[in-house]
């Protein structure tokens, strides 16, 4: 781990949980220091980066090497107390200076290759997600200045073996790990502590007088609510995978209007009565889509194609090709019904709504006419 890292620990029920950093942060730091070393022609043993969440990391550099106009460096992944398949492995970057003025990024040994649609990256590309791509390119550009160019390769010698312990294979990402992380920071907690920390935000908003709340799975949902729906971000609370728990907490606290907003990859599960959406607990995404497509008269051929999809995005592409996007409204309506069924024993049952959106921020389905929902939420 780094010798100095501006990360706070988390305390829950008297226990301290140590934060860590993502493979994306490792790749960004490795690329930055490799670029600096090739420019200065000098080995560097520490590097600092600012993560997308605004946290500054100062990390140890391992295996630095300079060879003419090329340098290589590695950062060791540390997930804190959230130990996953990539914990402890080295993430390398190799940077070669060029005269073309552009930064070209690719994955090398141990970084997976995308072989199927539906993961948000082009088929055939390296499994380096959008945010890490941006932070890597920005860090290298900062290091080399506006005029130089660079070829940047991210690689992880242990990646192919470590990836066998992840879901990459099921998603069609083959040959290695993914370079991921939207915030750059790993925040570990036990599930109960995590749920409780989410509920605390609900309590804070209710105590401040809020009667309406929008529950989202994560950061993307919050941005969508603010930027696409034009609603106050103060209405938003993250629910993660704990849909049922957060609904019950919201009712217990007295919220009068509860809305779920998220990508179908999470929310279609709720239409099937699944209120804990982590893939380790339950899935049912394709089965739910197939059921509602069948009710709309979809062909047997389409239903079979959807059954073979590994991701919701892949199924959504098929649905669009067949012009059956109206299925999302039906699913959103059923989500709303499921919410109401769960909360029917409340003394004052709340109004429930649901909105689903795509990764490119298009509204897919709503439980009621959109204007009615937005007016009620404002």
UniProtKB/Swiss-Prot annotation:
GO biological process: one example? methylation
Task: Report the enzyme's class at the first EC level.
Answer: transferase
Q: Which UniProt keywords apply?
A: Cobalamin biosynthesis, Methyltransferase, S-adenosyl-L-methionine, Transferase
Q: In which pathway does it act?
A: Cofactor biosynthesis; adenosylcobalamin biosynthesis; cob(II)yrinate a,c-diamide from sirohydrochlorin (anaerobic route): step 6/10
Asked if the Swiss-Prot or TrEMBL record annotates the protein with the keyword Phosphoprotein, the reply is no
A GO term, aspect molecular function: cobalt-precorrin-5B C1-methyltransferase activity
EC number(s) per entry: 2.1.1.195
Write down the chemical reaction(s) this protein catalyses: Co-precorrin-5B + S-adenosyl-L-methionine = Co-precorrin-6A + S-adenosyl-L-homocysteine
Source organism superkingdom: Bacteria
InterPro entries in the cross-refs: CbiD, CbiD_sf
Alphabetical list of PANTHER family matching this protein: COBALT-PRECORRIN-5B C(1)-METHYLTRANSFERASE (PTHR35863:SF1)
Family per UniProt?
A: Belongs to the CbiD family.
Name of the featured protein: Cobalt-precorrin-5B C(1)-methyltransferase
Q: Which organism does this sequence originate in?
A: Photorhabdus laumondii subsp. laumondii (strain DSM 15139 / CIP 105565 / TT01)
